[in-house]
Regions:
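Electropositive phosphate-/nucleotide-binding environments in soluble metabolic enzymes
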Residues: 30, 34, 51, 55-62, ...
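A structural motif corresponding to the C-terminal end of an alpha-helix
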Residues: 74, 110-114
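Conserved ATP-utilizing enzyme core subdomain
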Residues: 4, 8-30, 170-226
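Phosphate-binding/catalytic loop of phosphoryl-transfer enzymes
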Residues: 93-98, 113-193
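Glycine-rich nucleotide/cofactor/substrate-binding loop typically near the N-terminus or early
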Residues: 13-72
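Short beta-strand-loop/turn "lid" adjacent to the catalytic site in phosphate-handling enzymes
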Residues: 48-104
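Short glycine-aspartate micro-motif
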Residues: 1, 78-83, 149-153, 171
Length: 226
């Protein structure tokens, strides 16, 4: 997958029976080069499609799959399928509009493995907000934990998953995550991220700014929301 931080492609090797995770293998991040990151950032900021960028990002995902298989020590034939979310170019959930670049057929050709893709659109058609994978994965991780359970995932955008006693599943975005932090660090210091949270740990929260941010209308909206 490729997230809002636009730092690279994350790939993980999982064995599942569709209900439980039977085995976890290696996980890798294949970083984007500076030139491609700039190209991707440009089309995201404009909300436009680029066949060239789509082709490049699909090739990078294929490379990530090949690296992961090699690192995990498995033959390509042992992988049944690839889940491919692509990269979101624009997302307007209230209008049920979402678009991701990434060519699933091309990825299948490049890897020789079946590909499942474009699951965000189907989630929105069925009343979701276009982010179906994280909550289901969290639910599987929590199979053997005492319920209720809450899991907070801080990616570029932060999201929360609630799993109730009866396995009720509720998930929604809580607000900005690492994306704004990364932008701030880059524009002020020229670094891509606050590695290890060192700068954050050296300071303290500004309560006035935090209170003004918490007044944002998003926090008063009912779920589902993203």
């Amino acid at each position: 997958m490729s997230g809002t931080s636009m730092d690279g492609v994350d790939a993980a090797y999982l064995k599942t029976n569709g209900i439980d995770i039977i085995e976890t293998g290696m996980a890798i991040t294949l970083p984007y080069g500076e030139s491609f990151r700039n190209e991707l950032s440009e089309i995201v900021s404009k909300g436009v499609y680029s066949k060239n960028v789509e082709s490049q990002i699909t090739n990078i995902h294929a490379d990530a799959v090949k690296h992961l298989i090699k690192k995990n020590g498995d033959a390509r034939g042992s992988v049944d399928l690839i889940g491919f979310s692509g990269h979101t170019i624009f997302h307007i959930p209230n209008e049920k509009k979402t678009f991701q670049i990434g060519d699933g057929a091309m990825l299948a050709d490049l890897t020789g493995i079946d590909v499942v893709s474009d699951f965000r659109s189907n989630d929105m058609i069925n009343g979701g907000q276009g982010a179906p994978i994280a909550p289901v994965y969290h639910q599987v991780l929590a199979n053997n934990l005492k319920k209720p359970v809450v899991i907070l995932n801080i990616g570029g955008v932060a999201n929360i998953t609630y799993i109730g006693d009866d396995d009720q599943l509720i998930s929604f975005d809580t607000g900005p995550g690492n994306a704004l932090i990364d932008d701030f660090i880059f524009f002020r210091l020229g670094y891509r991220q606050d590695t290890g949270g060192k700068l954050a740990l050296s300071g303290k929260p500004d309560k006035k700014i935090l209170e003004s941010l918490m007044d944002h209308i998003y926090f008063s909206l009912n779920i589902p929301k993203s």
